[in-house]
Amino acid sequence: MASSNLIKQLQERGLIAQVTDEEALAERLAQGPIALYCGFDPTADSLHLGHLVPLLCLKRFQLSGHKPVALVGGATGLIGDPSFKATERKLNTSETVGEWVEKIRRQVSPFLDFDCGKNSAIAANNYDWFGNMNVLDFLRDIGKHFSVNQMISKEAVKQRLNRDDVGISFTEFSYNLLQGYDFASLNKQHDVELQIGGSDQWGNITSGIDLTRRMNQKQVYGLTVPLITKSDGTKFGKTEGGAIWLDASKTSPYKFYQFWINTADADVYRFLKFFTFMSLENIDALEEEDKNSGKAPRAQYVLAEDVTRMVHGEAGLEAARRITQSLFSGALQDMTQDDFAQLAQDGMPIIELENSADLQQALVSAELVPSRGQARTMISSNAVTINGEKQANPEYIFSASDRLFDRYTLLRRGKKHYCLICWKA
């Protein structure tokens, strides 16, 4: 992605929501590499899919020769960003936030290159400059540059200010000053000239631009990526089970892969532009191929494989593929113990049973049927499989050979209704 027309290429991919002084930024990028940053607050012990677009945007800039700074908010995470939030955030302990900072730092690292010469990435933590700052310095050196009149007019906090039942605390109200100072501090330390973030960060970004101009007498820029929505208007990155996390212990690679496989046709080519590094020409060619093939589209598989590989590595992708293929074919011999652990984590409904359980009881406990009578009917009609093998004996009692890895049994009714039995020790 050539640096000289990077802004234009990001726009063509639909990756720019707002940008300050677009013409001046494009000119600055044409002059040579810049340093830019994106902040990630530790509001949980993992990033989620909503963080992926700005994180990949950092990577796009680095691939074009620019120097990315990944800022983890060890200080701002203690305060909480009120932007477009209906209620006050719960304040977490400094110990908890410190642990989350390290987890998120490790999570961000594989996406960027920290050893590639002049544009090697930098990892930063804003606790480094806020941790020892006293309140008088904060008010005198930072607070004096902020107009309360302007702060209360920002869209990000307006809804809270207009509500009598919730309001906004001074703690959260001060967040805007903290993030603004991040920009000024990074500009001074690393000559950072651009901040990128989600579209909900526009107010915080413009505050940082103004503060940097006042404190450092430097012109800097801001760019936001759009809030990703699905074509049906629902939130992207959420399932009935909650958020899709980047941490494999919170969302398994299998579930992560399946999330992308289930992308709607109306969204998939747009998501390829947002979440992969495929060229626009190749995405357009894939869309044309899918339209004319008369078969199920390939795009979802391309998307799922690219993003799963990027987040979980080749081993994570292979496991997700292996589980998917095994469940589709009913042949479980290729599945590993770790694969079954992924299914038990979040891949399908699970139940725990005693070793003496029979098949009828298992079907009822798994809520695959409402009653033992219905279970008998289903079993007798060859609609039930155990570990991929049909079982037609309604009086069947599980044996040791049914317990894969001495722990798991996969139960299926019909073609799509699964349950994983985890046998009690």
Swiss-Prot record:
On assembly, the entry states: Homodimer.
Question: Known Pfam families for this protein?
Answer: SYY_C-terminal, tRNA-synt_1b
What HAMAP family does the annotation carry? Tyr_tRNA_synth_type1
Q: Which reaction does it catalyse?
A: tRNA(Tyr) + L-tyrosine + ATP = L-tyrosyl-tRNA(Tyr) + AMP + diphosphate + H(+)
Listed GO molecular functions? ATP binding; RNA binding; tyrosine-tRNA ligase activity
UniProt binding sites for ATP? K238
**A GO BP entry:** tyrosyl-tRNA aminoacylation
| Gene for this chain | tyrS
Which protein is depicted? Tyrosine--tRNA ligase
- Signal peptide positions on this chain: none
Q: Which PROSITE patterns match?
A: AA_TRNA_LIGASE_I, S4
Enumerate the PANTHER family for this protein.
TYROSINE--TRNA LIGASE, MITOCHONDRIAL (PTHR11766:SF0), TYROSYL-TRNA SYNTHETASE (PTHR11766)
Q: Mind listing the UniProt keywords for this protein, alphabetically?
A: Aminoacyl-tRNA synthetase, ATP-binding, Cytoplasm, Ligase, Nucleotide-binding, Protein biosynthesis, RNA-binding
What role is this protein assigned?
Catalyzes the attachment of tyrosine to tRNA(Tyr) in a two-step reaction: tyrosine is first activated by ATP to form Tyr-AMP and then transferred to the acceptor end of tRNA(Tyr).
Stored NCBIfam families? tyrS
Annotated compartments:
Cytoplasm
Question: For L-tyrosine, which residues are the binding ones?
Answer: Y37, Y175, Q179
Which residue range or ranges hold the S4 RNA-binding domain?
Answer: 357-414
